[in-house]
């Protein structure tokens, strides 16, 4: 009976938003794996298209130039939470999209409406085709990409906590410079005209500053299970 019950668990779409360094990726992957859901890192998609722009010599300061080629690269995301993948035109870009160069330019590329339209279409397609449900993490998932998501979560944390976490992820970055970069990124993401970083009105806010990763995961898993039980 248990196996039969497991198969009939309703699919659930979970949107997890928040700025960098709040634990979005670690939390989203763990929650998806624990609950048997697919997982999508939307930030990686924006990093991937930014990497492609840089690699092809596109002027990142020229929105018109970016818009003209936004549809060119083929970006494919693997949604297995235990081994998420991302390729651009068949090339594995999981490592190169995490460099400081890409990190410093992703906001400019992401702000171009044609880029957001292209990536948003990819995200919606992946979310609607996930048979068992999916955890989608990003900055505008609950507000723009999947406004009808079953559950919306907005993670926050103090700038200090975020910088400490982020400096451990990015090569060659110290905490102080990382903190400044994060605050600059926040300002850019929150003020852009197209799909700014924002908390959805119906999102559950979770401050991760003083929580361990495991505590955050348990909190989100509980929220998802409650939502799934109510469907």
From Swiss-Prot:
SUPFAM superfamilies: P-loop containing nucleoside triphosphate hydrolases. It holds the Pfam family Cytidylate_kin. Its EC number is 2.7.4.25. It comes from the Bacteria. Its main location: cytoplasm. This is Cytidylate kinase. It catalyses: CMP + ATP = CDP + ADP; dCMP + ATP = dCDP + ADP. Keywords: ATP-binding, Cytoplasm, Kinase, Nucleotide-binding, Transferase. GO terms for biological process: nucleobase-containing small molecule interconversion; pyrimidine nucleotide metabolic process.
């Amino acid at each position: 009976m248990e196996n039969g019950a497991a198969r009939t668990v309703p699919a659930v779409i979970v949107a997890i938003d928040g700025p960098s360094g709040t634990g979005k990726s670690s939390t989203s992957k763990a929650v998806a794996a624990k609950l048997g859901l697919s997982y999508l890192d939307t930030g990686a998609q924006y990093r991937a298209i930014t990497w492609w722009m840089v690699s092809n010599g596109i002027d990142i300061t020229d929105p018109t130039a970016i818009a003209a080629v936004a549809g060119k690269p083929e970006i494919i995301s693997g949604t297995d939470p235990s081994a998420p993948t991302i390729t651009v035109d068949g090339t594995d870009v999981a490592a190169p999209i995490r460099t400081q160069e890409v990190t410093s330019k992703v906001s400019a590329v992401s702000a171009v409406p044609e880029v957001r339209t292209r990536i948003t279409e990819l995200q919606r397609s992946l979310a609607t085709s996930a048979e068992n449900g999916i955890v989608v993490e990003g900055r505008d998932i609950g507000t723009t990409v999947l406004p009808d998501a079953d559950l919306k979560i907005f993670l926050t944390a103090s700038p200090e906590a975020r910088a400490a976490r982020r400096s451990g992820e990015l090569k060659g970055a110290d905490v102080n410079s990382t903190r400044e970069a994060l605050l600059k990124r926040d300002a850019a993401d929150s003020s852009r005209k197209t799909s700014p970083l924002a908390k959805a009105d119906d999102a559950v806010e979770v401050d991760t500053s003083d929580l361990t990763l495991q505590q955050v995961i348990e909190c989100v898993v509980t929220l998802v299970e409650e939502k799934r039980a109510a469907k």
